[in-house]
Regions:
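Catalytic cores of NTP-dependent nucleotidyl/adenyl transfer enzymes across multiple folds
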Residues: 2-147, 184-188
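Terminal (often C-terminal) interaction modules
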Residues: 148-189
Length: 189
């Protein structure tokens, strides 16, 4: 089975609730209960970004901007002929296998999407096939995440409103480096 078509069941987590598939119903789905949230970027409250706020079982509330993420992700996926989403899923599939093998610790699915979001479109569309393209993506990520090259403000979430690596984030640049290296080795590149 290839990392480009694997699907994994993860179960309910800290934020999402999994609704299991039953005979005659759709496949398992994850549901996230949330509340409306508005971020104001001006003192007169004229510049705003609408999002959602979720309250996990443990820890601090989480603010997301799903519409901005959807709009920007859809645009990037179109610009890259579907490779943005495909490579995000491939990285998550590799991460799932690496976790199952005990090679790395489990990371949130959104983190894989965030990493691929930061890869330039021309890198995502390069390569003669998906494997060569994914290899180029891993090289780009590795080079950008090296301690001597890493600049925190160069990395953002797909919504464009939050830095990827910030105090309180569920992941670090070290987690990303470990994931990229382990994926490279797993795929025997």
């Amino acid at each position: 089975m290839s990392i480009f078509d694997e699907r994994h069941h993860s179960g309910s987590g800290v934020v999402a609730i999994t609704i299991d598939e039953h005979d005659g119903t759709r496949p398992d789905i994850d549901v996230v209960p949330s509340f409306d949230y508005v971020r104001y970027d001006s003192s007169d409250q004229t510049r705003q970004h609408r999002g959602s706020k979720v309250f996990p079982k443990t820890g601090s509330p989480i603010v997301n901007y799903p519409q901005q993420q959807l709009d920007r992700g859809t645009a990037k996926n179109g610009r890259t002929n579907g490779r943005y989403k495909r490579f995000a899923r491939a990285l998550k599939s590799a991460e799932n296998q690496l976790v199952a093998d005990g090679t790395i610790s489990d990371l949130p699915s959104y983190f894989m999407e965030c990493l691929i979001w930061n890869v330039q479109d021309e890198i995502l569309t390069g390569g003669s096939d998906l494997s060569a393209g994914f290899k180029s993506v891993l090289v780009w990520l590795w080079n950008g995440l090296k301690e001597e090259n890493y600049v925190r403000t160069d990395w953002e979430e797909p919504n464009g409103l939050k830095y990827l690596f910030h105090p309180g984030a569920k992941w670090t640049p070290g987690d990303a480096r470990e994931l990229v290296l382990a994926t490279w080795q797993y795929l025997d590149y």
